[in-house]
């Protein structure tokens, strides 16, 4: 039985007490005894696991990042982060009372202790990081970890206020990535009727639309770009979508401007007052977090699970831990994993507004909340901060500007070299599919003015292309992630 309802009513002081207790126990009974990486790290750094008693004591433990999971000469390095108990380690690190209690519980259930421990720790499932910045890194799940995935999925269903008699449609790409499986397992845990189509790559947009109209789900879940594409396609065909009440988006940032555009398109198809939720997750945590219903396309922030993890916000330059509500880089520590375990993992994600506590102004839950204003540099680090025409720019600013122009239906930004010569000047081309009956000349000037004002960089060319060509350029129906910003510059 999940204790979520009780956890959402805890005070901030009680949350800290709970996390302190779980942190101390987890490190001493699971991480230090069974993790090859952390056993070696603690011994080399002379860290006594018994001295890790509170969240403040985490400062004794060094940060890790994705580079620590990837060994140039050791492609199996990720296995060092997997808990690997054996009979000797259990006898050495677990008190006899704990072993006897576990043995008694197994006996009462008609099981053998060895079998129960194997189910708890043995890897049986795997997902990968998406590999946009480095080689994909595998992360393992035991039966215990899959139960946690189920629980987090059911918690999100509760946050979305989806009832047991509602139907949902999972449009995330079918792949060994977190988003699809979080929805798949969460729906089962919540006893929901769910159709998982695998997204555009598996059934195609026509197939997904046919299924959507047949089962009439109250909620659909997927990548923002594909959900937008599917809803727009339904609008072109003149279909009624009044049965839709909730849209859940993941695997990419969701802005208020996007929510507004999607809401207007849904409203034109009969779907009025639809709640549009953003979610946040990453493979290393093997879970995701969600917003609760908020009016006017605002964000409640992502409701966290204080019994399952500790988050810190740090200064990305100095590593100093920041106060509640401060901006900084997000750092993740697991409190309840059995296979791949991360302590103080630097996500590379920068949060404006940090973490807040106290009752949520929308649902009243008292769980910690993470600001949804997140720049996911880890998604595209190689080009996110880039020099274009000699000016250092954050390419996410281009996305914010172009996505916020209502006259634009779809867009893509390409950075290239003149004549494809690596020693030539940079060129920036914006491909645009405008809304119907938009004056292209006026829109072109508006795009130039807004981009120059926000980034100090003006595009060399703005190309207007038809929607079907844009869909192919973005790979909306063929790739797991849209190709929104392309850096086509050849290396010198």
What is the role of each PLM region?
Residues 1-28, 32, 36, 190-492:
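Active-site glycine/GP-rich loop and adjacent strand/helix microenvironment
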Residues 136-140, 162-167, 194-197, 273-275:
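Short secondary-structure capping/junction motifs at helix and strand boundaries
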Residues 146, 173-177, 225:
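Short glycine-enriched loops at secondary-structure junctions
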